[in-house]
Curated annotation (Swiss-Prot):
The organism of origin for this protein: Homo sapiens (Human)
Pfam families: FCH, PK_Tyr_Ser-Thr, SH2
Annotated region (Important for interaction with membranes containing phosphoinositides), positions in chain: 1-300
GO molecular function terms noted in the UniProt entry: ATP binding; epidermal growth factor receptor binding; lipid binding; non-membrane spanning protein tyrosine kinase activity; protein phosphatase 1 binding; protein tyrosine kinase activity
Subunit text: Homotrimer. Interacts with ARHGDIA, IRS1, JAK1, NRP1, PIK3R1, PLEC and TMF1. Interacts with PPP1CA and regulates its phosphorylation at 'Thr-320'. Interacts with CTNND1, EGFR, FLT3, PECAM1, PDGFR and STAT3. Interacts (via SH2 domain) with CTTN. Interacts with HSP90; this stabilizes phosphorylated FER and protects FER against proteasomal degradation. Component of a complex that contains at least FER, CTTN and PTK2/FAK1.
Name of this chain's protein: Tyrosine-protein kinase Fer
Length: 822
């Protein structure tokens, strides 16, 4: 197999091959040039980062820190990586790229040489085998005519007896020319035959084989170039691997348990002797009736001591109850953190638990403070009880002197203690609250589908809906539906309302048959149809009978097969978000729910869809449907082309005009006014949770934290992760969410909008921002922000919720501002 033996008549294909290879080499050359540029820029960026860090790290703590050592080594190794990448880029330029450029020129020369030789030998072959033979054949035919003419004239001369010799001479001459030409033709024909054989058997194959040899040599050269490129650009070379090994080793040397040992040694202070708190006996120098550390029981104090004892007993009991609640909250949070820790996939996922761990430590501090208060109240109560019991049944002795002073002092002490208790009681009030479920319900009524339909097509099959949502759908005796277990994918459950209770029966699958406790069936629809039509009890013990199938809301239910997942758009709180396509070619956004999420998070995932089902507004992201027929569950939303508002602001900051920013704010106000009218509290209003659609229409999105409350107020335990910089003080302090707290968040959204995507409270941590707000601090308006907008922000950030404007007022004010800019 080879060019010479198999490609004799494939000249055009060979030319196309060479053209294609030249284009490929040009593409490779362009790619390598861009790779060199990219690597140089990457190396330069790394070096700039290291230089910047060096400037910012000039101030060092005066103790030895393993974290600092590790960080310093990471910077040093990053600098080393920068130098390596720069060297690699230079080697790539002087090596593979330079050789590839030379090879392209050689390739072009080979092509040119091949075309020239091929044209030459082909022209020679055509000349010998066609052109020259055709000329001889034409002359041959002409001489035959001339000879025949001379022959006829010779015969005529013989017949007439005139000029016979002359005619004979002409005849002989014509015959001689013909015979000589005949010999030339025979020789030329023989030569043409041999030339043709030589052309196809030797000359052309030799040219093609020569071309193939050069082609293969160039492939060999290209392979060498690729090999050198691979070695130079490899990220697993020994020098690069060593860089990362050094970094990894430095990270492994970080030991949280010993990190602060040196710091403690450097800054250790000797324990100061505690000052003893004793009764100041100098107070008694001018009074003989009072004794140090003794409760005075007499006719003036006996009654007040009883009141104080009763008050202290009540205070102690309340403190003990608070302490019990706090300790339960500690145990609950510890359990929650432990469960979350088990689901962490990466070491860095521990960051997600830090806020919860901080909340746990704060709870423990509160517990300790309450224990201290309990011990104090107990000691005070014991002291009072001892004095009261000592004098039980006795008549209080009279006080001769300073009755009024004694009464005043006693009264003041009582007031001080009561005041102190009140301050303690108020400081710990509202810490422990129970979260409320906010899942709604929907009314459904339809008849059962025939058992021949697949399970997913049965009206009474609701897919992987949460247990609590299934229970809300069951209202009357005999109401039933089938669902996939939310906690155990692949397991199916029959949910029934019977005798005032909502019962849940796992559908058993044994020996390829579905059953409860009686007859088995090959599929679930047949099993349910049997119990529904025959009214046979589900189990003898329960006596439950199926009467009313509860159909699913078909308006929103989609099949997984109706959606084709496309590119990954990003990651949400519960799973990935993809671009998808419906059967009618509609582009949508598909939110997925990870199958390994805890049950409570899966319920929250579907909560967003349940809320959005009820809404239809141009400034609220639209729900298309949900896919709950099997795991993983999908929420299908309209695809909003502009992406999230925060990224949009940062990307378009040089293009956005003031009028457009006001329009965005007005859109947000309109959307929130609509939500307020539906008694919906968003709880997480921020630029990152808004989307920008066609014609720059802003839409409120991400209802994962939202709640619907008839009273317009939602209480939270306060132990969950919340967006602190966007959340109102009353929500942070007491877990009280309302439309007024959403107004506070709207003010932060305004600040984000007119700062073009800057993070609120720049330079502050969450805790610092929270403390500053409590002290009365409010962010100043962003640069170029209109004064009217700044005033609206300040109104939104009024500490008292009742003083904040309504969304209807905000919409009116923003409309006026927009008109002024027109």
């Amino acid at each position: 197999m080879g060019f010479g033996s198999d490609l004799k008549n494939s000249h055009e294909a060979v030319l196309k091959l060479q053209d294609w290879e030249l284009r490929l080499l040009e593409t490779v050359k362009k790619f390598m040039a861009l790779r060199i540029k990219s690597d140089k820029e990457y190396a330069s960026t790394l070096q700039n980062l290291c230089n910047q860090v060096d400037k910012e790290s000039t101030v060092q703590m005066n103790y030895v820190s393993n974290v600092s050592k590790s960080w310093l080594l990471m910077i040093q190794q990053t600098e080393q990586l920068s130098r390596i990448m720069k060297t690699h880029a230079e080697d790539l330029n002087s090596g593979p790229l330079h050789r590839l450029t030379m090879m392209i020129k050689d390739k072009q020369q080979v092509k040119k040489s091949y075309i020239g030789v091929h044209q030459q030998i082909e022209a020679e072959m055509i000349k010998v085998t066609k052109t020259e033979l055709e000329k001889l054949k034409c002359s041959y035919r002409q001489l035959i005519k001339e000879m025949n003419s001379a022959k006829e004239k010779y015969k005529e001369a013989l017949a007439k007896g005139k000029e016979t010799e002359k005619a004979k001479e002409r005849y002989d001459k014509a015959t001689m020319k013909l015979h000589m030409l005949h010999n030339q033709y025979v020789l030329a024909l023989k030569g043409a035959q041999l030339h043709q054989n030589q052309y196809y058997d030797i000359t052309l194959p030799l040219l093609l084989d020569s071309l193939q040899k050069m082609q293969e040599e160039m492939i060999k050269a290209l392979k060498g170039i690729f090999d050198e490129y691979s070695q130079i650009t490899s990220l697993v070379t020994e020098e690069i691997v060593n860089v990362h090994k050094e970094i990894q080793m430095s990270v492994e040397q970080i030991d949280p348990s010993t990190e602060y040992n040196n710091f403690i040694d450097v800054h250790r202070t000797t324990a100061a002797k505690e000052q003893e708190i004793e009764f100041d006996t100098s107070l008694l120098e001018e009074n003989e009736n009072l004794q140090a550390n003794e409760i005075m029981w007499n006719n003036l104090t006996a009654e007040s001591l009883q009141v104080m004892l009763k008050t202290l007993a009540e205070e102690l009991m309340q403190t003990q109850q608070m302490l019990l609640n706090k300790e339960e909250a500690v145990l609950e949070l510890e359990k929650r953190i432990e469960e979350s820790s088990e689901t962490c996939e990466k070491k860095s996922d521990i960051v997600l638990l830090l806020s919860q761990k901080q909340a746990l430590e704060e709870l423990k501090q509160s517990v300790q403070q309450l224990r201290c208060t309990e011990a104090k109240f107990s000691a005070q109560k014991e002291l009072l009880e001892q004095k009261v019991q000592e004098n039980d049944g006795k008549e209080p002795p009279p006080v001769v002197n300073y009755e009024e002073d004694a009464r005043s002092v006693t009264s003041m002490e009582r007031k001080e203690r009561l005041s102190k208790f009140e301050s303690i009681r108020h400081s710990i009030a509202g810490i422990i609250r129970s979260p409320k479920s906010a899942l709604g319900s929907s009314a459904l009524s339809d008849m059962i589908s025939i058992s021949e339909k697949p399970l997913a097509e049965q009206d009474w099959y609701h897919g992987a809906i949460p247990r609590i949502e299934a229970q809300e759908l069951l209202k009357k005796q005999g109401d039933f539906l089938v669902r996939e277990s939310h906690g155990k994918p692949g397991e199916y459950v029959l949910s029934v309302y019977s005798d005032g209770q909502r019962r849940h029966f796992i559908i058993q699958y044994v020996d390829n048959m579905y059953r409860f406790e009686g007859t088995g069936f090959s599929n679930i629809p047949q099993l349910i149809d049997h119990h529904y039509t025959t009214k046979q009890v589900i189990t003898k013990k329960s006596g439950v009978v199926l009467l009313n199938p509860i159909p699913k809301d078909k308006k929103w239910i989609l099949s997984h097969e109706d959606v084709i997942l496309g590119e990954l758009l990003g990651k949400g709180n519960f799973g990935e978000v993809y671009k998808g396509t419906l059967k009618d070619k509609t582009s949508v956004a598909v939110k997925t729910c990870k199958e390994d999420l805890p049950q409570e998070l899966k319920i929250k995932f579907l909560q967003e869809a349940k809320i959005l089902k009820q809404y239809d507004h141009p400034n609220i992201v639209k729900l298309i449907g949900v896919c709950t027929q099997r795991q993983p569950v999908y929420i299908i939303m309209e695809l909003v082309s502009g992406g999230d508002f925060l990224t949009f602001l940062r990307r378009k900051k040089d293009e956005l005009k003031l009028k457009q920013l006001v329009k965005f704010s007005l859109d947000a106000a309109a959307g929130m006014l609509y939500l307020e009218s539906k008694n919906c509290i968003h709880r997480d209003l921020a630029a990152r949770n808004c989307l920008v659609g066609e014609n720059n229409v802003l839409k409120i999105s991400d209802f994962g934290m939202s709640r619907q409350e008839d009273g317009g107020v939602y209480s939270s335990s306060g132990l969950k992760q919340i967006p602190i910089k966007w959340t109102a003080p009353e929500a942070l302090n007491y877990g009280r969410y309302s439309s007024e707290s959403d107004v506070w968040s709207f003010g932060i959204l305004l600040w984000e909008t007119f700062s073009l995507g800057v993070c609120p409270y720049p330079g502050m941590t969450n805790q610092q921002a929270r403390e500053q707000v409590e002290r009365g601090y409010r962010m100043s308006a962003p640069q170029h922000c209109p004064e009217d907008i700044s005033k609206i922000m300040m109104k939104c950030w009024d500490y008292k919720p009742e003083n904040r404007p309504k969304f209807s007022e905000l919409q009116k004010e923003l409309t006026i501002i927009k008109r002024k800019l027109t």
